[in-house]
Amino acid sequence: MLSRFVVPTIVLAASMFSLPARAQNTPPTPFPAPDPGALPVDQSQEKHIDGWYRDVPVPPKDQKAAPAPRHDLSGIWEPAAGWRDGVQFLGAKEYPSDGKHILPFTPLGEKAFKANKPGFGTTEVPIALNNDPFDICDPIGFPRIELFNLRAIQILQTEKQVLIFYQNDRTFRSIWKDGRQFPSQDISEPRWYGYSIGKWEDDTTFVVQTAGLDARTWIDNVGRPHSGDLRVEERFHRVSHDILELTLTIIDPTMYTKPWNALSKFPLRLQPADFDLREMLCSPSEQAEFDKQVSRPAIADSKKK
């Protein structure tokens, strides 16, 4: 079971607290900090295996693209540039928390953002102060499930629904395409993954609207907030038989002065039909062990200073 890299996180976090505290006038840097002298990873040279420990063939670069089928998103998909492309540990792909990509916060949105204490990005805090709800095994929720650790997904279609099964958190979403509207203007029971309805805009573009999202979730891994008024639009455009592009737009006038694209034509590649999705789960027992070995000692250490 791939449990959100709990063991590597323990090692990294433990090493972090053995380092001297940052000077107060030193701006925070993303953790773990990249090695400026490291060569870029060529993911095409990595051995790629699925959840069944079987090799996944790398498609030939000169392979001619077959046309996209009509009204069909079904299949198993992974980030076309390699699994690292979907990690997004510094936040949404189009707006990483790097001090350069500034979101259009409302005053309330900025206040809510500052109240969130992530372990990554320009507002990162020591692990003792982190308040990421996913770190206590709350459901990751939507849209964060597509904006953090977007790995393999499997899309199934029925007459009335499109179902998306995610490797991350081993969960799924139902998207109704039978013409229904949202339950009401004021959805009284928000959901971790919201209420989703979709329709075909043309032969190869499926547009999804999602509302009724639980405001306790974060939009991404660096604590971008949302309100109960959040609407998310996804555009799944099947460019060819093997490539699917995903654009995800955040619409929340309570927190942001205008809509913004968290993903823009993010490419996913079709995998073989016998590709097995790995298991990635937040385990409460492993999280408890992490707290025992890392979080509690860090909190105790911070109180001594």
Model-derived features with residue positions:
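PEST-like low-complexity, intrinsically disordered acidic/proline/serine-rich tracts
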Residues: 2, 21-305
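Bacterial N-terminal signal peptides
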Residues: 7-18
